[in-house]
From Swiss-Prot:
Gene Ontology molecular function: ATP binding; ATP hydrolysis activity; single-stranded DNA binding; single-stranded DNA helicase activity; zinc ion binding
Subcellular location: Nucleus
Pfam entry (one): MCM_lid
EC numbers, comma separated: 3.6.4.12
Keyword annotations from UniProtKB, A to Z: ATP-binding, DNA damage, DNA repair, DNA-binding, Helicase, Hydrolase, Meiosis, Metal-binding, Nucleotide-binding, Nucleus, Zinc, Zinc-finger
SMART domains in the record: AAA (SM00382), MCM (SM00350)
Species this protein is from: Oryza sativa subsp. indica
Residues where ATP binds: G368, D369, P370, G371, T372, G373, K374, S375
Gene: MCM9
Enzyme class: hydrolase
Protein name from the UniProt record: Probable DNA helicase MCM9
Zn finger (C4-type) start-end: 165-198
Amino acid sequence: MPPPAEEFAVDDLDEFESRLDSFLNRFHADDLRRILLPDPDGKLHFPLVIDFAELLEFDPEVAHQLYDYPKDVLELFDAAAQRALDKFDAAARRADKRKAGDEPMEKKFVHVRVNTSGSPLECPEASPSIGKVRVKHRGTLLTLKGTVIRSGGVKMIEGERKYQCRKCKCRFTVHPELEAGNRITLPASCKSKSAKGCGGANFQLIEDSITCHDYQEIKIQENIQLLGVGSIPRSMPIILMDDLVDIVKAGDDVVVTGRLSAKWSPDIKDVRSNLDPMLIANFVRRTNELKSDLDIPVEIINKFEEFWAASRATPLKGRNSILKGICPQIYGLFTVKLAVALTLIGGVQHVDASGTKVRGEPHMLLVGDPGTGKSQFLKFAAKLSNRSVITTGLGSTSAGLTVTAVKDGGEWMLEAGALVLADGGLCCIDEFDSMREHDRTTIHEAMEQQTISIAKAGLVTTLNTRTTVFGATNPKGQYDPNESLSVNTTLSGPLLSRFDIVLVLLDTKNKKWDKIVSSHILAENTEEKKGKTSDPEVMWTLSMLRRYIHYVKQHFKPVLTKEAERVISSYYQRQRQSGTRNAARTTVRMLESLIRLAQAHARLMFRNDVTKLDAIAAILCIESSMTTSAIVDTAGNALHSNFTENPDQECILKCDSIAYLSKNIKYLTDEISN
């Protein structure tokens, strides 16, 4: 067993407690008075959150003692908070401000919670990754970041018992040891504070002296994106008690501050017991709403604004400069790069009249021959997303994608799968065709309703999966353009209809295209190409793209204009009336997809209004998914789509094409003539 930390000791305990009282009275008097107010929920435990940075500035010595000996100092802090609470309560009673019958119940359990945000305790030494926690951290105040992968049920455990010595009648309190499975160990002799001591070893339990607490165990795992290739993400069990229980669920991103301890592994015959590390939580902060750790400086935002100010005359040319930063090692594939950008940016989630949430995250599927760059797009998209999970269809089961029920210590718990862990981010599934049909059907609800309903091992619950699904698959055998997409991919119609964009990449013979691509690949490895840094696309590096995508998602909530609404409505009506329409694709989901993609394009163009241009861009993405199209030359095969020299002029020609196809709808014809 590792050597225990030195015991907590101060020269003058009374003086130390008075310093704690001074801190609470100065900074948290209003919080304590608020706790005294009548509570409609009838809670027994009340948190009092203090700021470690504030404490460090007020009294550095107390702050250092709190870091070195959190268990002892937090007990003194709780006692100080209770004294202050009693003092304020007595003052209120003397002032006679309460009406008769308005007496609140006695509030005996106040817990001081330490928030280390913005303090020196966010340094790597006091806030290491889970995989770097060592014995030297034992007993200290530690802050860990991770994702909840397992959440146990709420239990009730004993918090303390009071005993009385049969010899001298001295009363004392005994606390259970969490490290030893909540076992209570009586002292060897009486704890009498008399000079001689009675030496008694026979104790009697005082009736009605047992205090119970809520108790929950969760497990958090370190962020996969921060690990190198081949590294296994480590996990750490966390103990939550009292007001901290049941505030997080599987899939949540959390920051946990607590005391690092250890517990004995379960007793198994002929197996050596070991000490497993665990964190006894003092404060838990959910960071789901703050998923991005990107700190975007004002200078970068000014660069974005200057870029679009310079591109005001030719906005589509500016958009293409951004798109060229996506997978720059792959030549061309304009349609795919545009689709990737729109998928990552996404639309705006809204609630319809019936109260049902309509998702804003689009889904995308790449269907293509081997060697067409599908996996490279998946990996690059994962790098652009602030939170992502990459998996393959062959190595994924329905439980691994959704939620697994695992048994731990005689109790069933839920362990989050890939879609739950990617909540608020991106889930990339390569080799989509390798998944079993049963496993594919389990993600239907996750893709459309963005939840997963679970009924396993007596556990019935619903978890959020607000994630974008980006899949890649190979066609079944030789791709046949005359057959439907469902036949070529062996994917069911209901699953295909959930993908907003389905792009087909066919490696067909094209002498001109092969020559251009080979020249591009060879030029990438020449000294002349390596020395060039004057390209306008150099601005859009991976880091800059991540910041741009995050910024436009947070600051732009585009709304459809009348022109965009009419364009989308006209196109949808024509698709529904077409005699050669694909029934699996031309559903109401197609209309919702058009709206999402148009909103995403408006965000990409740094706007809050969805214009006719955005609607046309969304239509072009949808048309590229079709087997045949009179609007897009590369329909049925997005591999040979390239960036044009004059995209703004090209857009006018596309408008003509869309108007021609929808000539039976008067509005579009009038728009083009104007």
